[in-house]
Structures are given as structure tokens and as C-alpha cells.
């Protein structure tokens, strides 16, 4: 088997793996989707707030230490 044949087999193998994952996947119900969205939104707000606090501290502290 030449190199291109091995690459084709690797691609086919990967496609089979992806297909198997898609067969097992299911659409979440509304409750599960809603909870996931709420958690993601809460995490985004927390990360944003922490970044904002760090930004404010970096703006205030240099002036206070002079």
C-alpha cells in the first residue's frame, strides 16, 4: 500500500469515529439547554467581573503608590 492509500484509510477511520459520535448524540431538552445557557452566562459574567476588578486595581494602584 502506498502513502496515499494509508492516508485514505486514516481519513475513513476518522470519518467512522465522527459518525459514531454523531449517532450517539442527542438533542437536549429545553430544561437541559436552559440550565446550560444559564451556567455559561453566569461564568461569562464572573470572568468579566474578575477582569474588570483587575483592570480597576491596575488603574488605581499605580497612582496610589506614588
UniProtKB/Swiss-Prot annotation:
Chief location: membrane
GO molecular function, one term: protein transmembrane transporter activity
Subcellular location: Cell membrane
Membrane topology, record value: Single-pass membrane protein
InterPro entries: Prot_translocase_SecE_dom_sf (IPR023391), Translocase_Sec61-g (IPR008158), Translocase_SecE/Sec61-g (IPR001901)
Transmembrane segments: 41-61
Matching Gene3D superfamilies: Preprotein translocase SecE subunit (1.20.5.820)
Top-level taxon of the source organism: Archaea
Claim: Membrane is one of the keywords in the record: yes
Protein name: Protein translocase subunit SecE
Organism annotation: Archaeoglobus fulgidus (strain ATCC 49558 / DSM 4304 / JCM 9628 / NBRC 100126 / VC-16)
Lineage: Archaea, Methanobacteriati, Methanobacteriota, Archaeoglobi, Archaeoglobales
Amino acid at each position: 500500500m502506498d502513502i496515499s492509500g494509508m492516508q485514505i484509510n486514516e481519513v475513513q477511520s476518522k470519518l467512522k469515529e465522527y459518525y459514531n459520535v454523531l449517532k450517539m448524540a442527542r438533542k437536549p431538552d429545553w430544561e437541559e439547554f436552559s440550565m446550560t445557557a444559564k451556567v455559561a452566562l453566569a461564568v461569562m459574567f464572573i470572568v468579566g467581573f474578575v477582569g474588570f476588578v483587575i483592570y480597576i486595581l491596575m488603574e488605581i494602584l499605580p497612582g496610589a503608590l506614588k
